[in-house]
Amino acid sequence: MAKLSTDELLDAFKELTLIELSEFVKKFEETFDVTAAAPVAVAAAGGAAGAPAEAAEEQSEFDVILESAGDKKIGVIKEVRALTSLGLKEAKDLVDGAPKPVLEKVAKDAAEKAKAQLEGAGATVTLK
């Protein structure tokens, strides 16, 4: 097999959808027995253990959790697609599988904006 340069790999990744890229990352993690999120989790855990007083400060990253779609499921699916760039099937599966996170680790203002949009479409949403 020919060896690919870093630029060639990046060009190939640019052509993938987010779902395809996510599947690639999962396979990569399984094949090489690694976790893409490990360095971030270790750094966050070390920071939290070193300064427990800072934990009382306001949280800076939020997860937007869709609790239920309510009566207007189609409108909620449209909003989920707009917020996440998911395809129709993926957005429908996310809405049908509620409660599920729509957005993870986003800034407070982005989380509140997403919550307002989803609630405007008829969904029940919580921020964590």
Curated annotation (Swiss-Prot):
Which SUPFAM superfamilies does the entry mention? ClpS-like, Ribosomal protein L7/12, oligomerisation (N-terminal) domain
Q: Which InterPro entries match?
A: Ribosomal_bL12, Ribosomal_bL12_C, Ribosomal_bL12_C/ClpS-like, Ribosomal_bL12_oligo, Ribosomal_bL12_oligo_N_sf
Which terms are listed as keywords in the entry? Answer: Ribonucleoprotein, Ribosomal protein
Domain of life (superkingdom): Bacteria
**GO biological-process terms attached to the record:** translation
Q: Which GO terms describe its molecular function?
A: mRNA binding; structural constituent of ribosome
Output the Gene Ontology cellular-component terms.
cytosolic large ribosomal subunit
Q: Any idea what job this protein has?
A: Forms part of the ribosomal stalk which helps the ribosome interact with GTP-bound translation factors. Is thus essential for accurate translation.
Q: How does it assemble?
A: Homodimer. Part of the ribosomal stalk of the 50S ribosomal subunit. Forms a multimeric L10(L12)X complex, where L10 forms an elongated spine to which 2 to 4 L12 dimers bind in a sequential fashion. Binds GTP-bound translation factors.
PANTHER family noted in UniProt: 39S RIBOSOMAL PROTEIN L12, LARGE RIBOSOMAL SUBUNIT PROTEIN BL12M
Membership in a protein family: Belongs to the bacterial ribosomal protein bL12 family.
Stated name of the protein: Large ribosomal subunit protein bL12
- Organism source for this protein? Kineococcus radiotolerans (strain ATCC BAA-149 / DSM 14245 / SRS30216)
Question: Which gene codes for it?
Answer: rplL
